[in-house]
Regions:
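The feature marks helicase ATPase cores and/or their adjacent C-terminal helical subdomains
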Residues: 1-315
Length: 315
């Protein structure tokens, strides 16, 4: 079960993140303190609220408290703290570095240690994918570039009358997505990006046959018939061809490749030693389902169905 905590009050001082740990702790709201002091280390802990409500600093303080507690007990403890972008990850690490004994905890060789990284960088390194092989080295930039490529794909399909060719074979609902008067182009591009990433790459073997068999999802493109699936898959193929022409992979390729390495005998044997005792994920709402799947393979305890995870997300 999720332990739901709501960080409901804003931290008034803009320099709050630069205070020392004791000063911060004294200034916490009740809901923020619940996050920091939550005793459970086995069940997921969800922290939600509007931007500026102190979710991230609550996560950082919780991480520090866990490390200090296990240091005082003399028991090893490994934490990994994920962010979506490099800039956010660096900021989180900088804030943590202001806490006492932080240099020790930030050292990978310490008995109690924390690693600040992006999920994209972690997956790329775990799968041994060279930086030059990805369209962008930052997940946020990579996803922006994905949208640009998909926009080019749609533009080409409209100009070549491919969509009009399918008009007699597809529903009004699907056709309306390609009508700029009925659907904003940005909305269509984002829906296609989700379809390519989560549905086709995440849930099929990237073949038209398996995609046709796949059930649609409520928040996806409502393509239910074979012609509708064929139209969307033709756009997906164009997108893949663009990546191939540039000899690059997108963020979902990297994530899924990492999962294939994580869900394999070599890592399953190493997890008990090299896995993590606790996982943090800042801005969880920015990770898609493929990315969120990674968290299931990181904890040391392979027998537990629950993940020792604390995550923050905006309303």
């Amino acid at each position: 079960p999720l332990e739901h905590v709501e960080a409901s009050k804003s931290v008034e001082r803009s320099d709050f993140i630069f205070w020392n740990y004791d000063q911060q702790f004294k200034a916490l709201t009740e809901s923020q303190r619940k996050v920091v002091e939550c005793e459970s280390l086995t069940s997921p802990l969800r922290v939600d609220g509007a931007a500026g409500t102190g979710k991230t600093v609550s996560l950082l303080m919780r991480a520090y408290r866990l490390l200090k507690m296990h240091h005082d007990q003399g028991s090893p403890f490994r934490i990994i703290f994920f962010a979506h972008s490099e800039s956010t990850s660096l900021r989180n690490k900088d804030c943590f570095s202001l806490y006492p004994n932080s240099e020790y905890y930030l050292s990978p060789s310490s008995e109690q240690t924390i690693l600040f990284t992006t999920l994209f960088a972690f997956c790329r390194e775990f799968a041994h994918i060279d930086r030059s092989a990805v369209i962008e080295d930052n997940a946020a930039d990579s996803k922006t570039y994905q949208l640009m490529l998909i926009d080019d794909v749609v533009k080409s399909a409209l100009e070549s009358n491919r969509v009009k060719t399918y008009r007699p074979l597809i529903s009004d609902e699907v056709y309306a997505l390609f009508d700029s008067e009925k659907t904003d182009r940005a909305t269509l591009i984002n829906m296609l990006q989700h379809e390519f990433s989560v549905q086709i790459k995440g849930r099929t073997d990237c073949s038209i046959e398996s995609y046709i068999e796949l059930e649609t999802i409520p928040n996806g493109i409502p393509c239910k018939t074979k012609p509708e699936k064929e139209l969307i898959f033709s756009l997906f193929n164009d997108y893949q061809n663009m990546l191939q022409s540039q000899n690059t992979f997108d963020v979902d390729d990297v994530t899924i490749e990492a999962i294939s390495h994580l869900n394999a005998p070599f890592w399953r044997r190493k997890r008990q030693n090299d896995g993590y005792d606790y996982i943090f994920a800042d801005e969880m709402h920015l990770f898609n389902l493929n990315e969120q799947s990674v968290f299931h393979f990181l904890s040391k305890d392979t027998s537990s169905k629950e993940i020792p995870l604390c995550f923050a997300l905006d309303y």
